[in-house]
Structure formats: structure tokens, C-alpha cells
């Protein structure tokens, strides 16, 4: 998705 942000998916 948009590392390091995992929950953005």
C-alpha cells in the first residue's frame, strides 16, 4: 500500500 503505513489499504 504505502509503507510504512499498513492500514491505508
From Swiss-Prot:
The cysteine framework is V (CC-CC). It comes from Conus textile. It is found in: Secreted. It comes from the Eukaryota. Belongs to the conotoxin T superfamily. Contains 2 disulfide bonds that can be either 'C1-C3, C2-C4' or 'C1-C4, C2-C3', since these disulfide connectivities have been observed for conotoxins with cysteine framework V (for examples, see AC P0DQQ7 and AC P81755). This is Conotoxin tx5f. Keywords: Amidation, Disulfide bond, Secreted, Toxin. Its main location: secreted. One of its GO terms (molecular function) is toxin activity. Expressed by the venom duct. The modification Cysteine amide is found at residue 9. The lineage of its organism: Eukaryota, Metazoa, Spiralia, Lophotrochozoa, Mollusca. One of its GO terms (cellular component) is extracellular region.
